[in-house]
Swiss-Prot record:
GO terms for molecular function: ATP binding; GTP binding. Belongs to the RapZ-like family. Keywords: ATP-binding, GTP-binding, Nucleotide-binding. SUPFAM superfamilies: P-loop containing nucleoside triphosphate hydrolases. PANTHER family: RNASE ADAPTER PROTEIN RAPZ. Displays ATPase and GTPase activities. GTP binds at residues 59-62. This is Nucleotide-binding protein CKL_3564. HAMAP family: RapZ_like. Pfam families: PapZ_C (PF22740), RapZ-like_N (PF03668). NCBIfam families: PRK05416.1. InterPro entries: P-loop_NTPase, RapZ-like, RapZ-like_N, RapZ_C.
């Protein structure tokens, strides 16, 4: 099990760090009182590997409870529970600027000068910083750069390259565009099998419909171009930290054209080694002639 305790100065990026760890598959808990760490660790270690990556945010918001952290860490060590400490730091100037931009009050100086709160927090965190396994200074890091550093330290080998999950989703425009779409493609420019009597009651999964749709040169050309576009976009989305991509392909009812095109794109991406899922949102709705809720 990998057990990471995330701490550091207010405004240094702990919230962003915990989000990045969550993207890497960590079970994350924010602002857990330090006195609860031992019981929480014991519960996690008793899951027989069902939970194998844990990240906790412990910071000065815990007030007087924060001072109990060393007793809890010593207990973990005596019990043989391995843990790592990640400390987020930044310069006083950068922290002051971030607090002013966000218009937030420093937790140790709610009615006073931000700098005084920062200096007080530095003093209280000095010992935990000295015990940290990894220290990241975010003063000059953009959000993307912090994410890359977190990934470098805490991802499994090769996870950064395979993290993006693509979902190819077919749908019918008459039932509405999927609200979670990242990319939407309209294939209603292709001839509609609905108006062919022998194809009307079939779906885009059936060979007779697939053969009809794929017989048009426009279909093949569109699929080739869409595949090329996705092969270009996927690594660039990944580089910017995107972890999921929803590619929605729509026709009128989501039963014929969009299903065939979505299946074809799914198979091509899968053959190219991508992590990809397929979902036909409206195929059953259109068969029943119902309305999408």
């Amino acid at each position: 099990m990998r057990f990471v305790i995330v701490t550091g100065l207010s405004g240094a990026g702990k919230t962003q760090a915990i989000r990045n760890l969550e993207d890497l598959g960590f079970f994350c808990v924010d602002n857990l009182p330090p006195t609860l760490i031992p019981k929480f660790a014991e519960a996690c270690y008793q899951t027989d590997g069902k939970i194998d990556k844990i990240a906790l945010v412990i910071d000065i918001r815990g007030g007087q409870f924060f001072d109990d952290i060393f007793e809890s860490l010593n207990y973990l060590q005596k019990q043989g529970y391995k843990y790592e400490i990640l400390f987020l730091d930044a310069s006083d100037e950068v922290l002051i600027k971030r607090f002013k931009e966000s218009r937030r009050k420093h937790p140790l100086a709610p009615d006073g000068r931000i700098l005084n709160g920062i200096l007080m927090e530095r003093s209280r965190l000095r010992e935990i910083k000295d015990r940290s396994d990894n220290i990241i200074d975010t003063s000059k890091l953009a959000t993307r750069e912090l994410r890359e550093e977190i990934t470098r330290i805490y991802s499994e080998e090769g996870q950064m390259e395979t993290q993006l999950i693509v979902t190819v989703l077919s749908f019918g425009f008459k039932y509405g565009i999927p609200v979670d779409s990242d990319l939407v493609f309209d294939v209603r420019f292709l001839p509609n099998p609905f108006y062919i009597p022998e194809l009307k009651n079939h779906s885009g999964r059936d060979k007779i419909v697939v053969d009809y749709i794929m017989d048009f040169k426009e279909t093949v050309k569109f699929i080739d171009k869409l595949e090329d576009m996705l092969e270009f976009l996927i690594p660039n989305y990944l580089k910017e930290g995107k972890r999921q991509l929803i590619v929605s392909i729509g026709c009128t009812g989501g039963r014929h054209r969009s299903v065939t095109i979505a299946n074809t794109i799914y198979n091509r991406l899968k053959d190219n080694g991508h992590r990809v899922n397929i979902d036909h949102r409206d195929i059953e709705e259109d068969i029943k002639g119902g309305k999408k809720l």
